[in-house]
A protein has these predicted regions:
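Mid-chain, structured segments of secreted extracytoplasmic proteins
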Residues: 52-93
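Residue-identity detector for glutamine
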Residues: 5-7, 31, 86, 117, ...
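N-terminal targeting signals for Sec/Tat export/insertion, comprising classic cleavable signal peptides
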Residues: 13-40
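Short, exposed beta-strand-loop hairpins at the edges of beta-sheets
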Residues: 174-192, 196-200
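A structural detector for beta-sheet-dominated domains
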Residues: 57-59, 79, 163-167, 175-179, ...
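Mature extracytoplasmic domains of secretory-pathway proteins
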Residues: 32-62, 98-170
Length: 200
């Protein structure tokens, strides 16, 4: 299968995806995470880099993983979400352990596209992983942002998949026609065990 190119006039669904995946993202290393008393159905962790307070919604696996805290030596990958919980600065998932050593792990990124005439093109490049532990949120967001900037994702193509293939034979798939599900934003994988990444 190859990425199918969408019509020039994007549907509102793709406009929303383009708007989300071109938002600014923030990365903070070696943080302390403080737990907040629950006031809604979702619990939150506070991180306070640079005197700003960011609240991170604990969803999916994070809900059981983070109990009372505080937690030190955590990295956070933050994309500010719409104001769903009466909060101005909140993000979902993206919490990982700080590296114990330097990581420079290069993997092959292969992009296969099919244009309106049915011509198939393939682009192969290197993608650098710098984390021992990386969240699906960070991988999904950075890869889609790169696809938007370099390959006009959501401009002339709107469907397809990103597949993260692991050395042990496992794989993780992101479907390009929808935003990554919130519970998966908390999923964390071994960055050094990524074998290659395919987009098609």
């Amino acid at each position: 299968p190859t990425i199918k190119q969408a019509q020039t006039d994007m549907t509102p669904k793709y406009e929303d995806l383009r708007a989300y995946y071109t938002k600014p993202s923030f990365e903070f290393e070696k943080q302390f995470g403080f737990m907040l008393k629950p006031w809604t159905t979702v619990r939150f962790m506070n991180v306070i880099p640079n005197r700003f307070i960011y609240k991170i919604a604990l969803v999916g696996k994070d809900e059981k993983k983070y109990k009372d805290g505080p937690y030190d030596n955590i990295d956070v990958f933050i994309v500010l979400e719409d104001n769903k919980y009466q909060l101005k600065k909140y993000s979902v998932g993206g919490i990982t352990k700080t590296n114990s050593k330097k990581v420079n792990h290069k993997v092959e990124l292969s992009i296969t596209k099919k244009d309106n005439q049915g011509m198939i093109s393939r682009d192969v490049s290197e993608y650098m992983i710098t984390k021992e532990e990386i969240s699906l949120k960070e991988l999904d967001f950075k890869l889609r942002k790169q696809l938007i900037e370099k390959h006009n994702l959501y401009g002339n193509m709107g469907s397809g998949t990103i597949v993260i293939k692991m050395k042990n034979g496992g794989k993780y798939t992101f479907e390009l026609h929808k935003k990554l599900q919130e519970h998966r934003m908390a999923d964390v994988i071994d960055g050094t065990n990524i074998d290659n990444i395919e987009v098609n």
